[in-house]
């Protein structure tokens, strides 16, 4: 029998990142989703194209050998597919992990294969597979918890690839940047060894990869979006042509670089080259990346371990500089009531209905005695008072 991978999430990242590389590794991909339109399209279309875009031009790969199941209406089928799968991946958004965990738990519990299934969450969040693992354990019979590792192994991953808004009428086809990084920890697989997926960079310690990516790519991308939104710019590449925005982004990334260099023993030169590469990537006009797409979901982006508070809190604890990050945090707080983004409306409500202190605690999860807390309270208060900000 051929190799089989179950991919939760039939969206752009699921189709244009994860499935592309699973397909290239020789897996049949079974997409699982709850969106009727996505499942119907996948079921009715035998192939779709992934077009990789770079300054050198475009190249297109055709993806075939996939099926699709609606887990809302055909849960038993999903359980059976997981029971005989080699790999389970997901790209559903960190907030959705708790909703996919019950069916994955049932599928794992139904396994009789000797080799445990590899579970890899492909989300923009630190420790996403650990989070999913925790939810799966909650939905596993206590008598079966002790032997769970015989049926499944869970490995965290760091993913890095920009997927912009897609042109209208693209159907299942995905335009995506050519560059990618997919790092996955290999230690959880132990004596079984990791799955054979050549696109994955298998590592012993994932945290340096996750933090470097999250605190450089995601911090830089979101900083650009929030300053651009304040200035009424529509596209990320256009925003980075503005010398003031570009300089501000570099200042933010100098601060996160100082954390990454001191914490993870990455050389200053290596991190500087990484930062330059990232700024060049997000400046790519061929991606046609939209400011509102990059800025959406500000509540998640302002949370405790995310791209702003995560590095700023660690810098504050280490007594290092975090002024530019505070500016980015303020700009994120100003991303309110953006059409089509519920979190930006919720952010506006929280800032309107709470004191600066309560809003800071609610939005960032910072403890009141944390060295960053009072600085963020100040910025929250500034935004609440409608004061004009610099830049």
UniProtKB/Swiss-Prot annotation:
GO terms for biological process: mannitol catabolic process. It comes from the Eukaryota. The active site is at residue 213. One of its GO terms (cellular component) is cytosol. Signal peptide: none annotated. Its EC number is 1.1.1.17. It is an enzyme of class 1 (oxidoreductase). InterPro entries: 6-PGluconate_DH-like_C_sf (IPR008927), 6PGD_dom2 (IPR013328), Mannitol_1_phos_5_DH (IPR023028), Mannitol_DH (IPR000669), Mannitol_DH_C (IPR013118), Mannitol_DH_N (IPR013131), NAD(P)-bd_dom_sf (IPR036291). NAD(+) binds at residues 5-16. Keywords: NAD, Oxidoreductase. Gene3D superfamilies: N-(1-d-carboxylethyl)-l-norvaline Dehydrogenase, domain 2, NAD(P)-binding Rossmann-like Domain. Transmembrane segments: none annotated. Pfam families: Mannitol_dh, Mannitol_dh_C. SUPFAM superfamilies: 6-phosphogluconate dehydrogenase C-terminal domain-like (SSF48179), NAD(P)-binding Rossmann-fold domains (SSF51735). It catalyses: D-mannitol 1-phosphate + NAD(+) = beta-D-fructose 6-phosphate + NADH + H(+). GO terms for molecular function: mannitol-1-phosphate 5-dehydrogenase activity. Catalyzes the NAD(H)-dependent interconversion of D-fructose 6-phosphate and D-mannitol 1-phosphate in the mannitol metabolic pathway. PANTHER family: ALTRONATE OXIDOREDUCTASE-RELATED, MANNITOL-1-PHOSPHATE 5-DEHYDROGENASE. Belongs to the mannitol dehydrogenase family. Monomer. This is Mannitol-1-phosphate 5-dehydrogenase. It comes from Aspergillus oryzae (strain ATCC 42149 / RIB 40) (Yellow koji mold). The lineage of its organism: Eukaryota, Fungi, Dikarya, Ascomycota, Pezizomycotina.
């Amino acid at each position: 029998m051929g190799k089989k991978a179950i991919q939760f999430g039939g969206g752009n990242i699921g189709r244009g990142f994860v499935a592309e590389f699973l397909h290239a590794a020789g897996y049949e991909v079974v997409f699982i989703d709850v969106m009727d339109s996505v499942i119907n399209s996948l079921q009715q279309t035998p192939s779709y194209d992934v077009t990789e875009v770079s300054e050198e031009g475009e190249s297109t790969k055709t993806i075939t050998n996939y099926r699709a199941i609606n887990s809302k209406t055909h849960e038993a089928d999903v359980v059976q597919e997981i029971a005989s799968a080699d790999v389970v991946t997901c790209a559903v958004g960190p907030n959705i992990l708790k909703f996919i965990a019950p069916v994955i738990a049932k599928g794992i519990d139904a396994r009789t294969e000797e080799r445990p299934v590899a579970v890899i969450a492909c989300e923009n969040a630190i420790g996403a597979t650990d989070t999913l693992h925790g939810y799966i354990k909650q939905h596993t019979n206590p008598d079966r918890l002790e032997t769970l590792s015989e049926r499944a192994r869970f490995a965290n991953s760091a993913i890095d690839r920009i997927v912009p808004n897609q042109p209208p009428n693209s159907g299942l086809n995905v335009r995506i940047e050519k560059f990618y990084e997919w790092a996955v920890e290999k230690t959880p697989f132990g004596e079984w060894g990791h799955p054979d997926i050549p696109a994955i960079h298998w590592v012993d310690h994932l945290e340096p990869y996750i933090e470097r990516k999250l605190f450089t790519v995601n911090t830089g991308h979101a900083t650009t979006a929030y300053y651009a939104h304040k200035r009424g710019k529509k596209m990320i590449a256009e925003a980075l042509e503005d010398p003031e925005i570009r300089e501000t982004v570099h200042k933010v990334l100098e601060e996160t670089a100082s954390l990454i260099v001191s914490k993870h023993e990455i050389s200053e030169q290596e991190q500087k080259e990484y930062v330059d590469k990232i700024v060049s990537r997000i400046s790519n006009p061929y991606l046609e990346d939209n400011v509102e797409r990059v800025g959406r979901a500000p509540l998640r982006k302002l949370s405790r371990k995310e791209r702003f508070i995560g590095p700023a809190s660690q810098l504050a604890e280490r007594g290092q500089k975090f002024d530019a990050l505070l500016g980015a945090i303020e700009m994120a707080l100003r991303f309110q009531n953006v059409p089509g983004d519920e979190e930006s409306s919720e952010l506006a409500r929280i800032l309107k209905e709470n004191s600066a202190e309560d809003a800071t605690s609610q939005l960032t999860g910072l403890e009141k005695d944390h060295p960053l807390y009072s600085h963020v309270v100040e910025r929250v208060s500034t935004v609440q008072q409608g004061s004009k900000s610099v830049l």
